[in-house]
Amino acid sequence: FLYGLGASVGSLALTSLLRAEEAGLKPHKGHHSAPAKRCIFLMMEGGPSHIDTFDPKPELTRRHLQAFNRGGEQESAMSSGKRYFVQSPFEFIKAGQSGADICTEWVHLKEMVDDMCFYRGAQVESVNHPTACYHVNTGNRFGGDPAVGSWVTYGLGSQNQNLPGFVVLPRTSYPQGGAANWSNGYLPAHFQGTPLRPQGSPILDLNPPEGVTRNRQRANLDLLAKLNGKHLATREGRTDLEARMASYELAYRMQMEVPGILDFD
């Protein structure tokens, strides 16, 4: 990742560009005071079902083991064959002063429900995993729109200009649908997510190649920045080129910052 990036401020024009790019990631002040400074979004593909955790379905219990028929709707390969309603195997209780519904298996979490907000209005229009993942992460089952992390970064900015404002932490592998789940969509390219590797070094090439000193790397990146600046001068409005140039400088700063941030020993 970092080896393919790399550069800095090689000219006055590029300096101005990078300042503009960084301004998009700096903390923003909205119309109202925002108590949230960061967002952790858990996309648990294959995680516990909502009907087994926080969303009891009494009607599902009443119809337990009755045959399921879509009646009148077009059948698909995934809906063919016999299907049955199946109730949750867990019991639910009303917890906290709010009386929130929660599964009895959440022994400790039930003590915190008054500090939680439950949203039960989400629906998805696809039975396929990739399109369903796109819908959850971007709001569009066909992908192509900005991911939720891109919108949060766009709205809040980042408090640390030496690190990406939006990082992705895949557990063992990418979710179905791949990198489109953290795409910037039609937002400027620097709002896209930066994945960290789940195994080994979270980010590759945190150190320059053997035999390349920091000073030499700096000189190489400055030259690359100068050449990229000339290339961009004839292609105004190309946010992908602008973001790539800004990412070179970010990558260089990350080489200094990331080792300490990601050292959990």
Question: Which stretches of residues belong to each language-model region?
Answer:
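Ligand-binding pockets and gating/stacking loops
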Residues: 1-265
